[in-house]
UniProtKB/Swiss-Prot annotation:
Region called Disordered, residue ranges: 47-98
Keyword annotations from UniProtKB, A to Z: ATP-binding, Ligase, Nucleotide-binding, Protein biosynthesis
Record organism: Streptomyces coelicolor (strain ATCC BAA-471 / A3(2) / M145)
Quaternary context: Heterotrimer of A, B and C subunits.
Organism taxonomic ancestry: Bacteria, Bacillati, Actinomycetota, Actinomycetes, Kitasatosporales
Protein name: Glutamyl-tRNA(Gln) amidotransferase subunit C
Length: 98
């Protein structure tokens, strides 16, 4: 299997909105090759006889019942906010900007 190219790393970086330097492209290309190789080795071992798992140990969620408790009033919650609007925290817009 051919290795990951600098162009492929640059494409992935653009998709992730990352700006990488040329030397970082080389570095990450090597790292991605190592990761893909490790996944390929695991795929070779994984067989129909091996059940898929998401964790090596059995896990169970510990749930507790929801309880309604007193909480902060909107005024108390917003008392330390640098900016607020209509009983909400006002923050700088980040989506939709280029």
């Amino acid at each position: 299997m051919p290795g990951i190219t600098r162009e492929e790393v640059a494409h992935l970086a653009r998709l992730a909105r990352l700006e990488l330097k040329p030397e970082e492209l080389e570095h990450f290309a090597g790292q991605l090759d190592d990761i893909i190789g490790a996944v390929a080795r695991v795929s070779e071992v994984a067989d129909q006889d091996v059940p898929p798992t998401s964790h090596p140990l059995p896990l169970t969620n510990v749930m507790r019942p929801d309880e309604v408790r007193p909480s902060l009033t909107p005024e108390q919650a917003l008392s330390g906010a640098p900016a607020q609007e209509q009983q909400r925290f006002k923050v700088p817009q980040i989506l939709g900007e280029e």
